[in-house]
Amino acid sequence: MSKVKSITRESWILSTFPEWGSWLNEEIEQEQVAPGTFAMWWLGCTGIWLKSEGGTNVCVDFWCGTGKQSHGNPLMKQGHQMQRMAGVKKLQPNLRTPPFVLDPFAIRQIDAVLATHDHNDHIDVNVAAAVMQNCADDVPFIGPKTCVDLWIGWGVPKERCIVVKPGDVVKVKDIEIHALDAFDRTALITLPADQKAAGVLPDGMDDRAVNYLFKTPGGSLYHSGDSHYSNYYAKHGNEHQIDVALGSYGENPRGITDKMTSADMLRMGEALNAKVVIPFHHDIWSNFQAAPQEIRVQWEMKKDRLKYGFKPFIWQVGGKFTWPLDKDNFEYHYPRGFDDCFTIEPDLPFKSFL
């Protein structure tokens, strides 16, 4: 049979998706984290894979879904949090922009699955299914009550789930996980479609969202989930030593306040007394596209006058960051390869060919 007749849409999808195959899975498995360091990889949106010097693997907010895929329905879902926020009716054109860099069904070595809150782009049924099917039968699922309710509803056994609220500490091998206050006001207006928010006191944040501080033997990582800027970042900075801080950054559309701005990112880094501040989430949605270099421009303008003790780092999805080896770098570039050039004789017509 000719190729053009045997190839189908399904065969095309299976041969190209996920775009990175198991490349990053293999890289993470092979990584030997040196003493006094920790390594992490950006999985897209606020998804992070963290690996400690003891070989402990945890993932946070790993999401494998997508955004809008059709113009079929021109209207936003009734009661959507963005509709509540801005009084809009039109469909939000939020298309997923980055590739899928990690295959959840190729995960074999993992010690905990975490989520910061229950928004669709921060918790994933495919990840839960893959871990349940292919990994050790004691891997815990850790998150606030709303996340645990989702996991249990998907079929994760209740005894595998750990509900956390601010102040709780969970130890996973050599990583100490501190659940801290979250500041995600959008989460508080994420309600059933028939429930009104106007004139009603919101319920508590603690059941819906948490921030995390991961304390490893080689340093600490602060994961802010979808939190907006809050004065309470300074309280967290007073109470904990924070080496690297991750903040949800984006270019908010007109009438919307859902992501931190470049100024907010700098304020967060300063308030937390962090050493490095890294924006994330700006990659995922086409309508929140932002230029993270703006953060560095503002940092350059203010750092000497305000005596900043931190540096910004501009990352790429699928890239690795190692603390403290990368603490003085400003921007990530994917490995360029060809470091072994001229280890064998080139095969060219003559030396000056290229």
UniProtKB/Swiss-Prot annotation:
Recorded catalytic activity of this chain's protein: L-ascorbate 6-phosphate + H2O = 3-dehydro-L-gulonate 6-phosphate
Q: Identify the InterPro entries for this entry.
A: L-ascorbate_6P_UlaG, Metallo-B-lactamas, RibonucZ/Hydroxyglut_hydro, UlaG-like_MBL-fold, UPF0173_UPF0282_UlaG_hydrolase
Provide one Gene Ontology biological process annotation.
L-ascorbic acid catabolic process
CDD domains in the record: UlaG-like_MBL-fold
Q: What induces it?
A: Induced by L-ascorbate. Repressed by UlaR.
Where in or outside the cell? Cytoplasm
Record keywords, A-Z: Cytoplasm, Hydrolase
Q: What does this protein do?
A: Probably catalyzes the hydrolysis of L-ascorbate-6-P into 3-keto-L-gulonate-6-P. Is essential for L-ascorbate utilization under anaerobic conditions.
HAMAP family recorded: UlaG
Q: Which family does it belong to?
A: Belongs to the UlaG family.
Q: What is the designated name of this protein? A: Probable L-ascorbate-6-phosphate lactonase UlaG
Q: Which organism is it from?
A: Shigella boydii serotype 4 (strain Sb227)
Gene name as annotated: ulaG
